């Protein structure tokens, strides 16, 4: 009714369309209409009745709308989801909270750059140690050091702070045996030369030759020089009537 009153109060003019064969074929316009019908529309404006025209077109519009908008049968409802197994409990979908959003690329790089540095080399999380002894070398006590020398030291400067048994190498023993074969007693000059050649000290050369001479005498079953000299001195110092310390002559 509101639309009808609007059309009555306003000077409504029926839209003018050019004549077309489609309109005549579909009987939308009467066949007896002529081009003068469109030209004389304004003269018949006072006697135009929009209610009749609206009522005449309404059934066609409603029928077309009903024919185009005819809904089909409703789709079947989706099947319900299968129930979970008895051993598992249903879990609700986890939705990310507002505070757990991923950081921006710039914030991500700042977080990586501001990460704490790795701990020092000697710190152990299970056994924390003081900061002043973090990278300190382990203490080596005298009893932990190796006493026997099994390799030739070219940077040997001579002299030892503590007496120790020396383990000579095969090359050193071979050179000492060759020198002992030609001369069982060494002079100071020759001892220094051998010590520098074999990277040993003069004391080590002296002790080795002493031990080697004792072994040589033992192998050749020679009497000890000290015992022999002591017996000779005792025999020479006896009384004149008892030669060689024996009983007196009758």
Swiss-Prot record:
Residues 1-12 have a biased composition (Polar residues). The keyword Zinc does not apply. Residues 1-133, 219-250 are annotated as: Disordered. Keywords: Developmental protein, DNA-binding, Homeobox, Nucleus, Phosphoprotein, Transcription, Transcription regulation. A motif (Antp-type hexapeptide) lies at residues 140-145. Residues 161-220 bind DNA. This is Homeobox protein Hox-B4.
């Amino acid at each position: 009714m509101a639309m009808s009153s609007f059309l009555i109060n306003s000077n409504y003019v029926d839209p003018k369309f050019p004549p077309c064969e489609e309109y005549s074929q579909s009987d939308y316009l009467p066949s007896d209409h002529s081009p003068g019908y469109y030209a004389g529309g304004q003269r018949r404006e006072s006697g135009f009745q929009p209610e009749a025209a609206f009522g005449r077109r309404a059934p066609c519009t409603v029928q077309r709308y009903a024919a185009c908008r005819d809904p089909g049968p409703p789709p079947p409802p989706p099947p319900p989801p299968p129930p979970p197994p008895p051993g598992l409990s249903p879990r609700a979908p986890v939705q990310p909270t507002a505070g757990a959003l991923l950081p921006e690329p710039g914030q991500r790089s700042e977080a990586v750059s501001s990460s704490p540095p790795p701990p020092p080399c000697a710190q152990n999380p299970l056994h924390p140690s003081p900061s002043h002894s973090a990278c300190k070398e382990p203490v080596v006590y005298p009893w932990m050091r190796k006493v026997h020398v099994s390799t030739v030291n070219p940077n040997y400067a001579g002299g030892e702070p503590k007496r120790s048994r020396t383990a000579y190498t095969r090359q050193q023993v071979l050179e000492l045996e060759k020198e002992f074969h030609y001369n069982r007693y060494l002079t100071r000059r020759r001892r220094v030369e051998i010590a520098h050649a074999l990277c040993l000290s003069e004391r080590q050369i002296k002790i080795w030759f002493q031990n080697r001479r004792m072994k040589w005498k033992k192998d050749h079953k020679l009497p000890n020089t000290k015992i022999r000299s002591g017996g000779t001195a005792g025999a020479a110092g006896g009384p004149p009537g008892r030669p060689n310390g024996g009983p007196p002559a009758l």
